[in-house]
C-alpha cells in the first residue's frame, strides 16, 4: 500500500487553467517534504527544459502518475500504475488541458497502457480520448532519468522542439 508508506499525497501544482498538463512518474522524498511536484535537482532540470522552449514553469500544471512516494523510490509496479490510472485520467479531465506531456515510463503506462521501452515511444505525437475529448500527447524522458543518463538529453531536446511546434500549430497561448 503506497499510501501507508508515504508521508503525504502530492496531488499537483501549477496553473490549473493551463493548456499544458505535464505528468511525471511519482514523487520523491524532496517532493514529499515540500508538498509539491518536481522539486530539487529534478525540478531545476524541468524548469530549464521548459524555459528552453519559452515556457515558465508556473504557466503549466504538473502532477504525477502516482501521487505517493514509493518505498526506497523504486519504480511503481504495473499493478500500482493500473490502480492509480483511473484517478489520473479523472484528474486530466478536471484540468482539461489541450496538450499532455508524459514524462517517463510510469506516465506512459498509466495513460497509454504501453509498458515497452520509452525510447521506442518517445517523441511521437499520439492521441488519447478521455470523456469524449481527444487530447494530443507526447512521451519523453523524465528529468530524473535524464539526470541519471545525461546522454539522453539530446533526445529530450528534440521532443521539446516538437512540443513547441505543437503549441504553435494549435495556437495555444502560454
Regions found by a protein language model. Give the residues of each.
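A polyanion-binding, active-site-adjacent surface
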Residues: 1-174
Amino acid at each position: 500500500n503506497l499510501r501507508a508508506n508515504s508521508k503525504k499525497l502530492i496531488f499537483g501544482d501549477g496553473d490549473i487553467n493551463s493548456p499544458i498538463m505535464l505528468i511525471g512518474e511519482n514523487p520523491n522524498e524532496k517532493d514529499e517534504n515540500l508538498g509539491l511536484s518536481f522539486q530539487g535537482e529534478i525540478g531545476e532540470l524541468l524548469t530549464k527544459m521548459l524555459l528552453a522552449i519559452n515556457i515558465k514553469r508556473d504557466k503549466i500544471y504538473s502532477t504525477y502518475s502516482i501521487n505517493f512516494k514509493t518505498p526506497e523510490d523504486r519504480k511503481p509496479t504495473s499493478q500500482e500504475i493500473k490502480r492509480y490510472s483511473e484517478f489520473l485520467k479523472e484528474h486530466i479531465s478536471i484540468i482539461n488541458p489541450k496538450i499532455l506531456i508524459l514524462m517517463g515510463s510510469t506516465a506512459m503506462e498509466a495513460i497509454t497502457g504501453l509498458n515497452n521501452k520509452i525510447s521506442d515511444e518517445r517523441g511521437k505525437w499520439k492521441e488519447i480520448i478521455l470523456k469524449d475529448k481527444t487530447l494530443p500527447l507526447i512521451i519523453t524522458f523524465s528529468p530524473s532519468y535524464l539526470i541519471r543518463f545525461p546522454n539522453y538529453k539530446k533526445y529530450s531536446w528534440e521532443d521539446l522542439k516538437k512540443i513547441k511546434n505543437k503549441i504553435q500549430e494549435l495556437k495555444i497561448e502560454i
